[in-house]
Amino acid sequence: MASTVMSSLSLKPTFTLEKTSVKGLPSLARSSSSFKVVASGVKKLKTDKPYGINGSMALRDGVDASGRKPKGKGVYQYVDKYGANVDGYSPIYNTDEWSPSGDVYVGGTTGLAIWAVTLVGILAGGALLVYNTSALAQ
């Protein structure tokens, strides 16, 4: 009797899942469409001269520090190809973008008060955390 029961059992699972679609629910099945990533073009900076300190080479007697005449083969030969920032000097501000009223804080007194209250709150919160985790709180 045990042998007939064992022979009727299959060792391989025969679990099958039928695909059913429910109206209004999105399908979780993967589509066979291909995924392609395309990089955008290089953004060139348009400025009159490169940002770095050596944007224009003004050498005494027409020679560099080692006594050689420049051939124009430095990084600045690529200014027209890659844009002005070819020397790796990347300022966080540009004098052309400065505010004309840069000597006055735009936020005014209210902005300074909000900034001060935020700073005091952060410092007080840190002090409270230190106090609560120390032996003084017990």
Curated annotation (Swiss-Prot):
Chloroplast listed as a keyword: yes
User: InterPro entries from the xrefs?
Assistant: PSII_PsbR
Say yes or no: keyword Thylakoid present.
yes
The organism's place on the tree of life at top rank: Eukaryota
Q: Which UniProt keywords apply?
A: Chloroplast, Membrane, Photosynthesis, Photosystem II, Plastid, Thylakoid, Transit peptide
Transit peptide segment: 1-39
Which positions carry the signal peptide feature in this UniProt record? none
What induces or represses its expression, per the UniProt entry? Answer: By light.
Q: Give Gene Ontology CC terms.
A: chloroplast thylakoid membrane; photosystem II oxygen evolving complex
Family annotation (Pfam families): PsbR
Q: What is the name listed in the Swiss-Prot or TrEMBL entry for this protein?
A: Photosystem II 10 kDa polypeptide, chloroplastic
- Supply the source organism's classification: Eukaryota, Viridiplantae, Streptophyta, Embryophyta, Tracheophyta
